[in-house]
Every structure is written in structure tokens, then in C-alpha cells.
């Protein structure tokens, strides 16, 4: 599991919340105080809560659980995609379509269309139609890939979602709640911590902070996956005892 210290969090600015006038009173237990009308998050709470979330993530990864990273705002989207790809998981980084989880049957049809178009773009089909038709198909492919490219190989709903900004991604959280999918979320001082299984109080705007959370999550998932490989090898008799 990744080990994130209080110093790491301080350097990344995890402790800086939003302006005091935008606060959500439900975040009061996680707020240390205010400085220059900006709330300061209590990292003595954040560190163990984040470690608890990572521990859960590692357990899920060790059982081949599918993790969906969600972060569609500009500050998070690139880092979300990068982290998910680095640990061979899934992501939504552009826009959350209503029903992305709760209406999976329809989403699956759109994913099939995306994959068909990908094949057609490679096998010369686009060259056999008129320029106008080829352009329309290329645009459709681009649009579908932007929205569904990060989940096209997920093969069903995820086992856990990891969210950057609970307020911005409230629809994703609600859908996960409806399906009983555990939610890990970074929750800033302006957001509501309700209906989140693993609340991580922290700055959800600073790119350095966002990268810190995501890199730690990706490292943890990889560690969990390695555990699964070792256990599997032991069960299959591939691991030999090394005598002294």
C-alpha cells in the first residue's frame, strides 16, 4: 500500500479548504480552523482516513475488483486518466452521463457501437464511404471515445468508485449508492460527506493534491494486484520454497 505522510499532504496543499463562506457545516468535524477566510482541513483526521480508504482499495484490488476513477473537472481529468491507465483500471474524465452505472444495459450498447466504429476506422470501412459519411463516423467515434473510452473494457459495473470532488460528481455518487457500490471520495470543505463510504477530507482543486491522491491510489491498486498474483501462484504450485 502507498504510504502518504502528513508532510506529503502539507507540501501538496491538501489542508487548504474553500473560503469560509462556502463551507458545508457537515464538514465541521474535519476542519482545524480558518486562516485569511479560508478553512484549514485537519490533516490529523485526513491521514488515517485516507490510509483506511487505501487499505480498502488494496483489499478490493487483491480480489480482482474493478476500480472506476471519476474526475470530470478540468483540474482532475488528466490526472484521473493517467492514474487509471497506470494501474490498468477504468475512468470517467470528460462528462458523467446520467445512468452511466444505473442504466448499464444502454451504456453497454453505446460501448459496442464505439468498438464497432474503432474496428471500422482501422479496417478501411471509412475509406469506402463518402467523405461526408466518413467525417460523420469519425465525429461519432471521437464523441463516444471521449465519454466512454475509459470504461469500454470494464465489462460491467465497478466494485468501487474513487471520486475527486464529491460536490461536482454527486450524480456518480448517487448512482453508486443506488447500486450498493462502495464510494471513496475526496471531500472539500464546501461538499457534503453524506453517503460516502470512505470520506477523505482534503483540497479537491489543487492539481498537486489531486495527483497525490490518485498516485497513491494507483500504487495501492498495483500492490493489491501483485498480492493476488502471488496467492494465485501459490495455489497453482508455482512458488517454490527456497531452502537456506
Swiss-Prot record:
Keywords: Ribonucleoprotein, Ribosomal protein. Gene3D superfamilies: Glucose-6-phosphate isomerase like protein, domain 1 (3.40.50.10490), Helix hairpin bin (1.10.287.610). One of its GO terms (biological process) is translation. Disulfide bonds: none annotated. CDD domains: RPS2. One of its GO terms (cellular component) is cytosolic small ribosomal subunit. One of its GO terms (molecular function) is structural constituent of ribosome. PANTHER family: 30S RIBOSOMAL PROTEIN S2 PROKARYOTIC AND ORGANELLAR, SMALL RIBOSOMAL SUBUNIT PROTEIN US2M. HAMAP family: Ribosomal_uS2_B. Belongs to the universal ribosomal protein uS2 family. This is Small ribosomal subunit protein uS2.
Amino acid at each position: 500500500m502507498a504510504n502518504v505522510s502528513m508532510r506529503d499532504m502539507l507540501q501538496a496543499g491538501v489542508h487548504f479548504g474553500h473560503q469560509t463562506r462556502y463551507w458545508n457545516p457537515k464538514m465541521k468535524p474535519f476542519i482545524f480552523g480558518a486562516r485569511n477566510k479560508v478553512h484549514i482541513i485537519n490533516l490529523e483526521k485526513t491521514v488515517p482516513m485516507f490510509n483506511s480508504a487505501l487499505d480498502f482499495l488494496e483489499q478490493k484490488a487483491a480480489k480482482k475488483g474493478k476500480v472506476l476513477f471519476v474526475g470530470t473537472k478540468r483540474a482532475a481529468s488528466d490526472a484521473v486518466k493517467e492514474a487509471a491507465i497506470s494501474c490498468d483500471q477504468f475512468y470517467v474524465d470528460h462528462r458523467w452521463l446520467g445512468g452511466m452505472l444505473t442504466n448499464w444495459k444502454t451504456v453497454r450498447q453505446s460501448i459496442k457501437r464505439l468498438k464497432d466504429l474503432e474496428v471500422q476506422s482501422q479496417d478501411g470501412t471509412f475509406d469506402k464511404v463518402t467523405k461526408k459519411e466518413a467525417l460523420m463516423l469519425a465525429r461519432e467515434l471521437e464523441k463516444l471515445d471521449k465519454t466512454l473510452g475509459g470504461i469500454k473494457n470494464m465489462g460491467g459495473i465497478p466494485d468501487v468508485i474513487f471520486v475527486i470532488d464529491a460536490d461536482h460528481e454527486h450524480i456518480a455518487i448517487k448512482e453508486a449508492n443506488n447500486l450498493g457500490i462502495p464510494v471513496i471520495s475526496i471531500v472539500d470543505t464546501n461538499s457534503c460527506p453524506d453517503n460516502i463510504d470512505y470520506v477523505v477530507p482534503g483540497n479537491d482543486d489543487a492539481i498537486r493534491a489531486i495527483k497525490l491522491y490518485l498516485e497513491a491510489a494507483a500504487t495501492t491498486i498495483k500492490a493489491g494486484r501483485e498480492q493476488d498474483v502471488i496467492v494465485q501462484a501459490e495455489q497453482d504450485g508455482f512458488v517454490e520454497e527456497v531452502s537456506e
